[in-house]
Curated annotation (Swiss-Prot):
It comes from Mycobacterium marinum (strain ATCC BAA-535 / M). One of its GO terms (biological process) is Mo-molybdopterin cofactor biosynthetic process. PANTHER family: MOLYBDENUM COFACTOR BIOSYNTHESIS PROTEIN 1, MOLYBDOPTERIN COFACTOR SYNTHESIS PROTEIN A. Catalyzes the cyclization of GTP to (8S)-3',8-cyclo-7,8-dihydroguanosine 5'-triphosphate. S-adenosyl-L-methionine binds at Y55, G97, S148, M219. This is GTP 3',8-cyclase.
Length: 360
């Protein structure tokens, strides 16, 4: 069995357990040096997953983070409090790996829901196991979910995820809708070979079920570093595949800092109208309006999905640092955020961590 190393980038502040000095403002919004304000926090709860999508993980053999390196629920609750009350975070999304594999998920959601001002709380999940927990998550304070689903073709699903779990995901979507975790959004990363066919049926399915589809361009975040720009199924390809089957027009509502470009969809008299979005992270990057900050399952702040440096908050927590020191380290990390991800630059270097160990 081939074992793929997880890979950890350069970590700032790991050894000394103290905040890193910078020119970052000491209070107010969580700014970077280009004037962007981070209000959206992505929190990874685990690097483990029960699917094995090829664009994210190898078929087998990925080393997991040791359990003692992962943040516990009390540590997560404290960092959430600092983020919301001191850094101005207004939206918290829990991710993985697969966050439903984190036993303390409901506890952490409840901790976020108790904060004032209360942030919007959402979850990105593969949907396996969601049907059984959707009601409890809603009771804990979860507002809505995004479910990753790349196709509604069972054979294609099994080929992409290396698991035959499509029925479980569909049940999870229905469970989320029944629990009021709406709008239920579907995140799709399209396979270069089957995606043009899959996206037509996937959009039709989402319109019929009342879900909102988001098609996400595949990014260079796979564990095997096999991503190639010339194999990308980009946003223009997606629209070209859909236009023969649906009437599409741009959503006139202001986009703001949202990553998705939204389209209004008319599918004809037999299918409800709706909307869908395309997140063109590669072909039409939106880095200039990015409002995200990221916390990995092992307590590292990443200013960008494609960062090559991380700032260690777990070390600060476990060294007994006060809220002020943790806040300062977080602000320093975000102040150093690059202008863009650089995917289309000839000198681009893929992050050492795969997506499963960063959080989407």
């Amino acid at each position: 069995m081939t074992v793929t190393a997880l890979g950890v980038p350069t970590v700032r502040g790991r050894s000394e357990g103290s905040a890193i000095a910078s020119d970052a403002p000491g209070d107010g919004p969580l700014l970077d040096r280009f004037g962007r304000s981070a209000t959206d926090l992505r929190v990874s709860l685990t690097d483990r997953c029960n699917l094995r999508c090829g664009y994210c993980m190898p078929a087998e053999g990925l080393n997991w983070l040791p359990g003692e390196q992962l943040l516990g629920p009390a540590e997560l609750a404290r960092l959430l409090r600092i983020a919301v009350t001191r850094l101005g975070i207004t939206s918290v999304r829990f991710t993985g790996g697969e966050p439903l594999l984190a036993r303390h998920l409901e506890e952490v959601v409840a901790a976020a829901a108790q904060l004032r001002p209360r942030p919007e709380i959402s979850l990105t999940t593969n949907g396996v196991g969601l049907a059984k927990r959707a009601a409890a998550l809603a009771e804990a304070g979860l507002d809505r979910v995004n479910v990753s689903l790349d196709t509604v073709d069972r054979a294609h699903f099994a080929a992409i995820t290396r698991r035959d779990r499509l029925t479980d995901v569909l049940d999870g979507l229905a469970g989320a809708r029944a629990a009021g975790l709406t709008p239920v959004k579907v995140n799709a990363v399209l396979d270069p070979e089957t995606g043009r066919q899959d996206v037509v049926e996937l959009l039709r399915f989402c319109l019929e079920q009342g879900y909102q589809l988001r098609v996400i361009e595949q990014m260079p975040l796979d564990a095997g570093h096999q991503w190639r720009r010339n194999a990308l199924l980009g946003s223009d390809d997606v629209l070209a595949a859909l236009q023969p089957h649906f009437r599409l027009r741009p959503d006139p509502a202001p986009r703001g800092s949202a990553p998705a470009e939204l389209w209004l969809v008319d599918a004809g008299p037999d299918t409800p109208a709706g909307k869908f979005g395309v997140i063109a992270s590669v072909s039409h990057a939106f880095c200039s309006t990015c409002d995200r900050t990221r916390l990995t399952a092992d307590g590292q702040v990443r200013s960008c999905l494609f960062s090559t440096e991380e700032t260690d908050l777990r070390g600060l927590l476990r060294a007994g640092a006060g809220d002020e020191a943790i806040e300062a380290a977080w602000r320093s990390a975000m102040w150093a955020k690059p202008a863009g991800h650089g995917i289309n630059n000839p000198d681009f270097v893929q992050p050492q961590r795969p997506m499963s160990a960063i959080g989407g």
